[in-house]
Amino acid sequence: MHLLYFCLCLNLSINILSYMKHLKKHILVILCALQVQYSLALNLQKDWLIDGSSYQAKVTTTDKELCLSNGLLSRTFILSPNVATIAFDNLMNGNAELRAIRPEAVLTINGMEYPVGGLYKQPVQNFLNNDFIEDMISCDTAFTYVSHTVGETIERFPYRPKQEWLSNKNPWPAPGKRIVFTYKAAPRAPEMIRNVTVKVIYELYDGAPILSKQIEVENQGKSSIVLNSFKSEILALTETAPKVHYGEPHEIRMLAQEPGTYTRNYRK
């Protein structure tokens, strides 16, 4: 009799434990589902494609630096000894995209090439840190920083959207922040360009990871000049497709490695 009672109690205990384990699995599944739903809801709130109203462009400044950011991307400039982009960050995934400093632009005037801004003497080109930046110098032939202004984006051309084609009434110009850097020719520059002023203009827009850039060249001298060509953007970016995990050729993203040149025969 005692043995039978013991067996019944043991069987009941096993059934209870099995039920508890089964119940625990259900509770775990429910908690996981709630976590996934919460994460999705959180991502939906932060997704700029769905609602980008929280990503407002702004400009922050310190003694020697200026940062243009909207919560999705940021671009940081150093102002002395010359203006140069020292950081270009993807805030959506936390990646730092810049590995080396380049001029802000390059102009070819009367057949001669002149950098605009930028710093030189970076000891290595595959990464960038503050120690490198502190020891870098301005090129003696580069257009040098004079001043900058910060304001709102401006209308580049008149635009009247046809409301019957649009579901949303978006403002024009697209709202955001605008920075204008003004440069003058270096003291050692040739006489023909000493009265040339260059403006490099950046606009970062609200609610989207979009940055526009343009340059303006003004000759205030008496002699005419010829602007043969220009490079408005030169960025030394971190490698996104190293050889250790490359796939087929169409899967490789090709980037400019040096001003004016591109990678070739990448798989070799």
Task: Enumerate the predicted regions with their spans.
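Bacterial Sec-dependent N-terminal signal peptides
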Residues: 1-43
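Short, surface-exposed terminal/edge motifs of secreted or surface/virion proteins that either
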Residues: 75-77
